[in-house]
């Protein structure tokens, strides 16, 4: 059975954010703490990217207004011995979703890993 790399996108809300950098740091730290507490320290966490609709330049998926930030995180994990891409997706969503309760998740990419 093949192995897959599954990338999920999460929308993380940060309250009392002082800046964009602060919101990114807090989001990564809080997500990492929750994943580590669930013994899922093998999940890679990073800030996602978005492209400007006007110029096409990439920028970090972070938005801060009135001290509240929303950060788009990318969560990547390898799923071993999955029966199909759909099976790998279900495994990743269940594991990460359980650790990051009440955080919206969306599948961004599923590729066969080596």
Curated annotation (Swiss-Prot):
The record ties this protein, via InterPro entries, to: UPF0212 (IPR007564)
Q: Which Pfam families match?
A: DUF555
Q: Which cysteines are joined by disulfide bonds?
A: none
Checking NCBIfam families in the record gives: PRK03922.1
| UniProt record similarity statement | Belongs to the UPF0212 family.
What name does the UniProt record give this protein?
A: UPF0212 protein UNCMA_00570
| Species assigned in the record | Methanocella arvoryzae (strain DSM 22066 / NBRC 105507 / MRE50)
